[in-house]
From Swiss-Prot:
Complex formation: Immunoglobulins are composed of two identical heavy chains and two identical light chains; disulfide-linked.
Organism expressing this protein natively: Homo sapiens (Human)
Keyword tags: Adaptive immunity, Cell membrane, Immunity, Immunoglobulin, Membrane, Secreted
This protein's name: Immunoglobulin lambda joining 1
Keyword Nucleus: no
UniProt KW Calcium keyword: no
Compartments, as annotated in UniProt: Secreted; Cell membrane
Biological process terms in GO annotation: adaptive immune response
């Protein structure tokens, strides 16, 4: 299965979605699927 990363996004950079990555933010969650579909939940 794809590796799912759960890490705080860099404060110096804006919230972004990374391929096959999972970013958890205080006010937003960014889900990235292998299909390239990006879903941002604010």
């Amino acid at each position: 299965p794809s590796r799912l990363l759960l890490q705080p996004s860099p404060q110096r950079a804006d919230p972004r979605c990374w391929p096959r990555g999972f970013w958890s933010e205080p006010q937003s969650l960014c889900y990235v699927f292998g299909t390239g579909t990006k879903v941002t939940v604010l």
